[in-house]
């Protein structure tokens, strides 16, 4: 009897451990993740003509995949609040797309901001330049964006069939059953040096559209169609565009103004910014990001901006950057760095300094 009691205790303890382990394993079971790419959609209680709406899900929301219909048109999902329902596949993107956006954010965490901008219409944030590329987040009208880089892509011609998108990878159990599933490793498709697409042997020339790599107020990074974004160019320098397109602008330094323009002007003296501005041709699809630069300095005597430096015929590549550097006897001066392609197509770095109204190219 003395031996039976310890044995029973041991068996009971083992059973409890196994039960707890099984429960933990079941409760911690991971599901395939999917994300809402539509602005907003709803979950239905069944896949049928007549159904009830059981929940509303919003753009960017993460959902757990429970199962799919045979034709993969509908997906059975669960929200973070534990609500189950069916949703159309076209309103979702997979974990692979979400991870591409995460990679874009990591890769461009320290990229210098080229300009501030505002969306003038609702627009989608894409993983790569192009209307037919995957998108997840939708940006509202009036949203503030930091511009990081620029590229271009061909616009689909009217009547042309859109490029087919690879199907979302099914769960592991379904993949074993479906031998025809094509699952490939996703890589970030961010182009650093855009190449003009090859024209078809016959047919019209492709229409090229500029795209911008941007970061929104929530830190999300992706590509937007450039024509849906307005640059927040300071009014005092916007008037000097001369029909060219401003693609980047930076404050190099601030200088004091000499006070009122006339005796009747009671405004006190203030500091005025001096700018580096990058320009390009007013047409999408250029092989360069910018082809000229101008430095605007302030004339305190005449209370106006003047062009202190101008350089044309550049094959420029974004991003550009600004800074400050100690030049011994000259003191600490503003500097700016450009990246341009030489005649061989190699991207080289050029560094300049601003000393008063004088800009000098520094020797490498």
Locate the predicted segments by residue.
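Short beta-strand elements that form the blades of beta-propeller/WD-repeat-like
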Residues: 272-286, 332-342
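Acidic, small-residue rich beta-repeat scaffolds with periodic aromatic anchors
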Residues: 144-147, 179, 203, 237, ...
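C-terminal motif of bacterial Sec signal peptides marking the signal peptidase cleavage site
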Residues: 19-22
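Bacterial N-terminal signal peptides that target proteins for export
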Residues: 1-12
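Pro/Ala/Gly-rich low-complexity, hydrophilic intrinsically disordered segments
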Residues: 84-122, 131, 168, 204, ...
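SH3/SH3-like beta-barrel superfamily modules
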Residues: 53-88, 137-227
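Bacterial signal peptide processing site
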Residues: 24-26
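Post-signal peptide N-terminal segment of mature Sec-exported envelope proteins
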Residues: 30-53, 58
């Amino acid at each position: 009897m003395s031996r039976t009691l310890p044995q029973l205790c041991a068996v009971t303890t083992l059973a409890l451990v196994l039960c707890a382990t099984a429960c933990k394993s079941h409760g911690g079971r991971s599901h395939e993740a999917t994300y809402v790419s539509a602005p907003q959609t709803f979950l239905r209680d069944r896949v049928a003509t007549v159904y009830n709406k059981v929940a509303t899900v919003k753009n960017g929301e993460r959902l757990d995949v429970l199962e799919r219909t045979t034709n993969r048109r509908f997906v059975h999902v669960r929200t973070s609040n534990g609500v189950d329902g069916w949703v159309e596949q076209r309103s979702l993107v997979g974990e692979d797309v979400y991870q591409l956006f995460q990679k874009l954010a990591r890769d461009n965490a320290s990229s210098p901001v080229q300009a501030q901008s505002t969306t003038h219409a609702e627009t989608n944030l894409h993983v790569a330049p192009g209307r037919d590329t995957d998108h997840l987040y939708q940006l509202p009208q009036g949203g503030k964006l930091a511009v990081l880089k620029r590229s271009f892509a061909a616009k689909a011609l009217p009547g042309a069939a859109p490029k087919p998108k690879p199907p979302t990878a099914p769960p592991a159990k379904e993949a074993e059953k479906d031998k025809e599933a094509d699952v490939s490793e996703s890589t970030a498709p961010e182009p650093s040096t855009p190449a003009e697409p090859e024209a078809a042997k016959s047919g019209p020339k492709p229409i090229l559209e500029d795209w911008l790599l941007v970061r929104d107020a929530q830190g999300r990074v992706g590509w937007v169609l450039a024509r849906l974004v307005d640059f927040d160019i300071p009014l005092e320098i916007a008037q000097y565009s001369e029909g060219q397109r401003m693609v980047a602008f930076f404050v190099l330094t601030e200088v004091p103004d000499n006070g009122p323009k006339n005796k009747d002007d009671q405004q006190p003296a203030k500091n005025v910014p001096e700018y580096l501005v990058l320009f390009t041709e007013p047409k999408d699809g250029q092989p360069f990001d910018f082809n000229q630069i101008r430095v605007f300095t302030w004339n305190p005597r005449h209370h106006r901006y003047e062009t202190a430096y101008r350089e044309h015929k550049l094959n420029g590549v974004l991003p550009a950057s600004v800074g400050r550097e100690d030049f011994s006897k000259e003191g600490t001066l503003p500097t700016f760095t450009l990246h341009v392609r030489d005649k061989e197509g190699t991207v080289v770095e050029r560094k300049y300094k601003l000393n008063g109204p004088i800009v000098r190219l520094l020797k490498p």
